[in-house]
From Swiss-Prot:
Major subcellular location class: cytoplasm
Superkingdom per UniProt: Bacteria
One GO cellular component, as annotated: membrane
NCBIfam families per record: infC
Family statement: Belongs to the IF-3 family.
Name the UniProt record assigns to this protein: Translation initiation factor IF-3
Species name: Picosynechococcus sp. (strain ATCC 27264 / PCC 7002 / PR-6)
Amino acid sequence: MKDKRRVKRDLPKINERIRFPNIRVISGDGEQLGIMTPAEALAIAEEEDLDLVLVSETAKPPVCRIMDYGKYKFEQEKRAREAKKKQHNADLKEVKMRYKIEEHDYQVRVNSAQRFLKSGDKVKATITFRGREIQHSNLAQKLLDRMAKDLEEVGEIQQRPKREGRNMMMILAPKKST
């Protein structure tokens, strides 16, 4: 059976939905019209065929603006889309290798890590040990330190090399651009 409690909708506060004794009103061209009741402000807005939109609820008294609500909503959505487009979420990319890696293979890993860091992603460099190779963790440590040194122009160490089970790993983050 469905729950029949009322769901409070997050409706925008415009026109008749503004419930305050007094509000500060700003006209469409940015001119302050002063403090008045919502009914008086709504009458002015309707004269101009515009809406009364609550801009700041926390101000004393609350601030309302006379404007075209459809246009205002469109502008807000457009700004939100632009902000989302500019935002880049840093992913964690992984570069795997063994401690007995050949020079060319190592350079390939460094180049791919460099590409990831330049695109703004974090890089997790992992060295895997098999069998008794785990005894040579000092060689893996040296290899990760060398990789950090080779990538110091584009990245900085976020997590120092450490051993986890049969792996040794290090995390590099892109350098902050100044």
